[in-house]
């Protein structure tokens, strides 16, 4: 019978990779908690309309990348390609806006996009997302960026570049769109890639986001969106930059930064690295003041970001996994019950470890103890079972001593094992 293998673009995560993800989530909870964020868990499956209305029907995500299928009642469902839309749906449905003026929410979990798998970019990938719902002030944008940079710093990441831009608002962006469309009409459209030719008609701002070198060269002299920001948008953006300057946070003004989703307005930002291959983005986000009302909710502004966990993992410095405190080597089958009870007593006192059940020679039992990585091996054979004792062997020094079974926990704790 042939074996069943995993789907292309999906991965199984064993230690140490899974340990990196656990550490990432732990640091996220610690940092975000200092800023007053609470954790939200949303479903992996949502109605397809949610993403069409939020992300935009003309985006690459909706056009080419979503895992969409009908259920048994022929309702179109989609495995979430990003988290923000689901958070907005949950926020509206729960009536949370009636309970508190400001909501600070974070989520983590798997997302799904049908893309070409590459380094740090899989078809099932994991994100950490933060959303601030309620404030319209630029201080919310700045605080979110500061929190993101603090999170990345506490992960131990270096060599990052914060890029930032302002996409304007519904008042000034149409003027820029017209100026950009006029510019695009004046260049050799045939030299643009197929995606850019399509975007010229549906969403010309996305042409600026194209990574094809030929397209970037052709659009190098395109008008910039910052030049077309209205006074209110420029004041908002300047306030964000002023706060970042006051905290000595370095950034790069990137007037081509438009992000890949249609719901962004005003502040948009991205953190990039040149050490992880194609495109190099590890986190990004921005303001989305019209998204909640666009999904049928109240007119509540918002700002948020997402971090790609696989991409962050490529950059995280190695960290030694904590060693188990003990491993019980059972040398006599008759001692297996006592070994299990001993291990349970030790675990009840906060110690971690394993028991080597099964038959085998003393040599094989000790080899298993060595592979466990434990600091101490607790040897329990027939003689020890009869005497109520345990041989405690220090796995680093090789020294060992025989002590009473009820003294083992104190011995391990005193040794700092």
Swiss-Prot record:
The keyword Methyltransferase does not apply. Signal peptide: none annotated. One of its GO terms (biological process) is histidyl-tRNA aminoacylation. GO terms for cellular component: cytoplasm. It comes from the Bacteria. Its main location: cytoplasm. It holds the Pfam family HGTP_anticodon. GO terms for molecular function: ATP binding; histidine-tRNA ligase activity. It is found in: Cytoplasm. Keywords: Aminoacyl-tRNA synthetase, ATP-binding, Cytoplasm, Ligase, Nucleotide-binding, Protein biosynthesis. Disulfide bonds: none annotated. PROSITE patterns: AA_TRNA_LIGASE_II (PS50862). InterPro entries: aa-tRNA-synth_II (IPR006195), aa-tRNA-synth_II/BPL/LPL (IPR045864), Anticodon-bd (IPR004154), Anticodon-bd_dom_sf (IPR036621), His-tRNA-ligase (IPR015807), HisRS-like_core (IPR041715), HisRS/HisZ (IPR004516), HisRS_anticodon (IPR033656). It catalyses: tRNA(His) + L-histidine + ATP = L-histidyl-tRNA(His) + AMP + diphosphate + H(+). Its EC number is 6.1.1.21. Belongs to the class-II aminoacyl-tRNA synthetase family. Homodimer. This is Histidine--tRNA ligase. It comes from Nitratidesulfovibrio vulgaris (strain ATCC 29579 / DSM 644 / CCUG 34227 / NCIMB 8303 / VKM B-1760 / Hildenborough) (Desulfovibrio vulgaris).
